[in-house]
Each structure stands twice: as structure tokens, then as C-alpha cells.
Amino acid sequence: MRMKVSDYIARKLVDEGISDVFMVTGGGAMHLDDGLGHEPGLHCTFNHHEQACAIAAECYARIHNKIAAVCVTTGPGGTNAITGVVGGWLDSIPMLILSGQVRYDTTARSTGLGIRALGDQEFEITKAIDCMTKYCEMVIDPMRIRFCLEKALYLAQTGRPGPCWLDIPLNVQGAYVETEELLGFDKNDYEAGGTGWSVHGTGCDGCGLCAGKLIQGKPAMIPEDEAGKGEKRELLPPSVSLDLAREIVKKVREAKRPVINAGNGIRIGKAFDVFQRVVEMLGIPVVTGWNSLDCMYDSHPLYVGRAGHMGDRPGNFAVQNCDLLLSLGSRLSIRQVGYNYPTWAREAYVIYNDIDAEELKKPTVHVDMPVHADVRDLLEKMEMVLEVEAVSADGGPKDKEAVDWWISRCQQWKEKYPVVLPKHYEAGEDQPANIYAAIKEISRRAEEDQITVVGNGSPCVVGGHAYEMKKGQRFISNSAIASMGYDLPAAIGACLADHTKDIILVTGDGSIQMNLQELQTIIHNHLPIKIFLINNGGYHSIRQTQKTHFHEPLVGIGVDSGDLSFPSMEKLAWAYGYPYVAAHHNSQLGEAVEQTLATDGPVICEIFVDMEQNFEPKAAAKMLPDGTMVSVPLEDLAPFLPEEELAENMIIPMIKPQ
């Protein structure tokens, strides 16, 4: 069938199961805009900034592991999308970005000269995004379009997921091709070390048409095709053997103080259900991490807490005191192991699972048993082993009494050290609300199976501390790049990915300014997003940093530095057409949250909070008597406990800061 390339792309996306596209139109993508916008099988959401498109698509993919496409124009269209793409790259989120480009004969690359640009608004985006994509290519041959699309979609979702980007010049977008002549991507050839070119088209058996495209048995590819391509070959993990699964189960059964560290790879790897079953079969404590809060609900009897640099006391006490740590689907970043990483889980036998073999080699993590495996495959094999051993006489832990004591100890930590404390509710009518009380009031009213998205800064940190997860809930943040401005577009992506319940968004007065224009996208599309805006007078995370490490006056913080200001959110709500709710004191929190959640459609609830409330607990440097600042182990979180109390919580020997 004769078809324009841009129309073929649109139809191909639908055939591959994609139903949503986030885009900002532009002249450099005019054929793509036309093809995607008129494809009946695609729902196009038109944002007001390309960064918002990319962030929305990233969050969309987090909800049900389904890709949404992004379409932007040449030059600034592509560069604007970069922050959202690097967020997907670092957090291992599958994405497909399509960008328009000037006609190939007006690109600097086509001249062979060292000029910066030739065409109008030209920028060779592939050179900029090679470091944040699994595969990128400027598609200069219309006959490669099927291959490039299939390759991009395969790589984005295979192994460790991540973004793939195709840059498509105008002359290629508008070219016509016979779709039967297009050659596809052969994943088997690719994984065997080949290029992935299918020798023949679909259903073809050595026809003359395909033979005419071959050069010495290979499809015709010229060096110019390779010049605009970036690609990272990935070693896919082998299938997990039952012997390996059995060895892991054996190690867990032999431990007296085992704990599971559940990472977000469990969600990304579609392993959530089997993870829940394996946890019940193993019957050992579980901690979650910075971006994996929703791997287990808080009231589960085996859930302990959140571990890591921004974790809580129960979670870190469990990790630091364990004698075996089974880490599943977590890359164990610095935020998980802390800056004093030699002291992390220092007396534990560490079984470290990751789908990326390179992550297992990091010098910041001590590993006794590295497990290069797809977490779903690993858990399914462990489940098979456990199902067999469950009916045998020795199916449980070797020392059941010790493990039962350990589970009880973990629950004691959980009960003794809640994040939200009575003091957070003490503020009177003459004082601002407390952010910990605010997060508590929002989370206790959120429903099961509801999605909460948080912006970066206070909502992410305090939300990560204090949000009480219920069954089926999702808690979405971008943890690695942690860009301000994530909030509104991420909530849009989550809302379009899941229509079953209203979306809760918790963001800050600083972060929301970075993509404020997306308030219009929400209101235009009638998206039921409940926006809780934490007003702490500016950039509270940086305020704390400057107060801790530098002298006043503060710089570039907000109301207390005097050199940065923010508009009235009440007036902005009116301008954009949002209902507006406000809470100035703790006593107003409950009613304000309930009113917001009961409002039909999008709504803004502004909560004015105390600017003096620091994040707590958190990892922090400790000053020695001689004035030296040192990073302490993760069991010793600020505000620091008395040494006697800390010692009471340690089963293993304490380390004296020095």
C-alpha cells in the first residue's frame, strides 16, 4: 500500500498498542503532526511545553507499563524535551520520542562541513541525546522507517527499559513508500549480535523485491545511516535457573535476621503480583526505597519502613541490623546506601539483583551474591522452589524462633518510630500548618487503588517519609533526576493512563512554577486532578541546605531571602478557572482536604506551612567535638537520638564517628 511516512508512523504506533501521544506542534514536525493528529486510533494531548510532553509520557508509562509517544518539532522542540527524557533514562522508564527535523539536504551533516547549522532552527539532536537514550537515530532513508520504529519500541521495553528517540527530517516525514517493501527489525538477529535487519519483509520467502535491497546478503545501509545513530548494546540477563533460585531461598532460610529491599524494578518489571506472593511464602520483613513506596502497603504485617538516605528509622534499623539482605529490582543508588556506604548493611550477606549487569559492579555497594536477572523471572523461579519446599518438613527458616523474634523487633521499630509525631499537630491558630500533618491528612483520606503524584522538593521528601500507603495505591515521583516542574505534567500522564479514580497531586510553590502552563492543559481536558500546593515561601530544600552550611543572608530562596518572589496562587486559580481551597493552620487541614477531594474535576488546595520545619528524619553529617563534619551510618538519622537510645536499637556493634 502506498502511504506517506508520517501516516505510516501513526498507523504503526496503533498496531504496536500505543494509544496516547503527547505533543507540541511545529513546522519541523508538520507531517508528523498531521499524521498523528488525524489517526483515529490515537488520542493526542497537546501540551504547552515540550518538557511537559516528555514528563507526561514518562509518568504515563509508570502506571501500567505501557508506552505513550512524544512528538516535538526541530531545534528548541527537541532540546526542551530533554529534561523529561533524562528523567526516564535514569529511572528506567520506556519512552518513544519522535522529533521533526529540517529537510536532510539543509542539515549541516549533509554538507560534510564543520558548520554548526544550515537549516532554519536546525539542531542535530541525536548528538545531544545519545547519552540518555538506549537508541537514537536521524532517519534519513524513508525505507528504514519500519525497521527504526520496531527497533526503538523493542529496545525501549526490553532488558532495562529506557527512552528511544527517532529524529525524522521533513523530506522523510512527507515521503511516500510502498509499505509492503519496508523491512522490519529481527530481534533474534539483534540479540545474536547482528544489526537486527530482517533479511526479508513480513511473509516474504526470498522474493526478488527483497533480494534487490541486499548487498552481499545484507540490506542496503550506507555510512550516512550510521552517522546519526546512537545505540547502547545491552547484555540481556540469562534465564534464572531453579538451582540459583534454590540457592537464594536456602540463604534466606539460613538467616536469622533477613530483610527484603524492594525496588521500583518490581513495578517496572511487571513483577508486583509475584513479589507479593513470594513475600508471603518467605515470611520475612520488607523495606521499600525512595521510589518504591508503593511496592507494599504500610499496614502489612511484614512491612517495616523506608530505607535509605531519605528513609525512616524503622526501615534503616532493619537494613543496618540484618544478617541477610535480598535486594530485588533496586539499583541501590547513593540515596539507598548513603554517603558512608561502607557502613551500609555492614554485617549482612547481600544478595543483589539487577537487570543491568553494570549496576552490580558499583564500588558503592558490597555484594556477596550478584544476581543478573529479570526480577520477574527471578521471583517466578523462587516461587516455584518455595511451592515445592512448602510441603516439605524443612520448608521454613532454619531458626524459626530467631526469625520470629526478628519480625517482632522490626514491628516494634515501626510502632515506636512513626514519622508523623504529636508535635507536628501542635501548631496553634496563630501559626502556619505543619507539612507533616498536611501529608498525613491527605494520605489518610486517599482511597485504596488511588494514584498520588508528588513534585520534587518538600512534597517528594515529606511525602516519601509520611505518606501512608494503602492497598493498590501508587505513589509516583521522579527520583533520580528529581527535576522541579515534574508535578503537573506527571499528573497529566498518570490521569490519562488510568481513568478509574481522581489523581492526587502534591506539589510545592517553587516546583509548580517550572511548568505552570500545564494548568491550562489540565483544565482544557477536564482532567480530575486534585492539586495540593504546599506553600512554604519558596525553595525549602535549598533553604535548609543554606542554613546548614552557609551564613545568612540566604540567596535565591523566596520570601526570606527577598530576592525571589512567587505569584498569588489564588489569583492564578481564578485566571485558569480552578476552584480554590486554602488551609492556613493545622485546624483547617481536615476540612480543606475533604472539600478538595469532594470537588468534581480539577481543583487547587493551597496549604500554607511552617518555613522552619526541617525534613525529619534524614541522613545528615554529624559534627565531632573538634568541629569536623562526618557522614554517619544510616542507623543514625537526624535529629540524632541520644547515644544510649541508639545503642538500644542496634543488634550489631555500633560505629563511632571519627
What feature does the model see in each segment?
Residues 1-390, 445, 528-531, 551-552, ...:
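N-terminal alpha/beta PP-like core and its mobile active-site loop of ThDP/TPP-dependent enzymes
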Residues 6-9, 14-19, 24-27, 32-39, ...:
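Active-site diphosphate/adenylate-binding microenvironment
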Residues 26, 269-272, 276, 316, ...:
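Conserved structured core elements
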Residues 38, 98, 106-120, 309, ...:
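Thiamine diphosphate
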Residues 132, 441-450, 573-578:
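A structural motif corresponding to the C-terminal end of an alpha-helix
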Residues 143, 192-197, 201-231, 235-239, ...:
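Phosphate/pyrophosphate-binding active-site segments
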